[in-house]
Amino acid sequence: MTENNNLVTSTQGIIKEALHKLGFDEGMYDLIKEPLRMLQVRIPVRMDDGTVKTFTGYRAQHNDAVGPTKGGVRFHPDVDEEEVKALSMWMTLKCGIVNLPYGGGKGGIVCDPRQMSIHEVERLSRGYVRAISQFVGPNKDIPAPDVFTNSQIMAWMMDEYSALDKFNSPGFITGKPIVLGGSHGRDRSTALGVVIAIEQAAKRRNMQIEGAKVVIQGFGNAGSFLAKFLYDLGAKIVGISDAYGALHDPNGLDIDYLLDRRDSFGTVTNLFEETISNKELFELDCDILVPAAISNQITEDNAHDIKASIVVEAANGPTTPEATRILTERGILLVPDVLASAGGVTVSYFEWVQNNQGYYWSEEEVNEKLREKLEAAFDTIYELSQNRKIDMRLAAYIIGIKRTAEAARYRGWA
């Protein structure tokens, strides 16, 4: 079984338990355990050398009982159907947790944009939209940025969809440049959401952010913004990593210096001679550990070595079920991904609302509304976990899936 098969299976297992605790029967689980629609497309792209290369793309729409589906599009060589399926299920949970009128969606293309020219990436982006255009739209399924996609790619996709639709459709996609209807604060919303989760977790442990020792795995979009936010709040960032290694300084790394040298793909460690391994990064003495890279990073093999008292999941699925159990038994407060990383989809929702009404908010208004939603969600999930004596992941799944299940029941789907 591949890692992505494991992600789907473990997610299904927790959803099943959550539905059982909510009193829903097997029929509801049968409906929710798989996406309602799973699209695979082939995208021919003329490369700069004149040859034509055909790429495989996916779009999953997990459940639209509540409303249109919502979720990012990632460009990565490891994208496959199972990963996209699992990610769409998590998006349903995130939307339920922060009370958004969406179901979960997700998309991806099997490619390595680091090995492509900007013109090739543009042609691929437009080709993907042409391939999925009948299945998406501002009231059907709304894409957004994800791994190795950004506001420029969203702009190309919006332009292509608008040409096909013969109507300017800014609400078709979120994460756009401000000038094309993007929202203030969207580019750093995922990281700010993680900061809010860290603040709430620290509050429960009577911990001050100022002076706290933090380790962040991943220095991409979310990881780098997160490092900067925490650095400015006075936290001591003692370890960061990227795809090539990790850096450690017990006295705290100079985050501004690293950000100045980071490339567009979040790489910085290759500029340094002295690095540590990913394994050593997770063993560092710290107060807060934030996995902000890829899935299955905290496992039963290294969960006993973690020294942090708080783990906040900024990445999707970084902790296996076995590791979750170990961390919980050790008394470590684990804030799950579906709560901690919900900032991105929340501000995407704000962008969609602003597009629909043609009235735009300041960054201060966006951040205030984001904080209000995420603090309320954290309070609800933490209180449920304490009252029922369950871990925060199961509590988050109970809150996250309840709305979709109730909407499906009222519609007569299960």
From Swiss-Prot:
Per the UniProt record, the site (Important for catalysis) maps to: D146
Please name the catalytic residues of this protein.
K106
Give the record's GO biological process terms.
amino acid metabolic process; glutamate catabolic process
**Can you name one GO molecular function term for this protein?**
glutamate dehydrogenase (NAD+) activity
Q: Does the keyword Nucleotide-binding apply?
A: no
* Residues binding NAD(+): T190, N221
Q: Which InterPro entries match?
A: Aminoacid_DH-like_N_sf (IPR046346), Glu/Leu/Phe/Val/Trp_DH (IPR006095), Glu/Leu/Phe/Val/Trp_DH_C (IPR006096), Glu/Leu/Phe/Val/Trp_DH_dimer (IPR006097), Glu/Leu/Phe/Val_DH_AS (IPR033524), Glu_DH (IPR014362), NAD(P)-bd_dom_sf (IPR036291), NAD_bind_Glu_DH (IPR033922)
Any idea which UniProt keywords this protein has?
NAD, Oxidoreductase
Which family would the database say this protein is a member of? Answer: Belongs to the Glu/Leu/Phe/Val dehydrogenases family.
Official protein name in the record: NAD-specific glutamate dehydrogenase
Instruction: Please state the gene responsible for encoding this protein.
Output: gluD
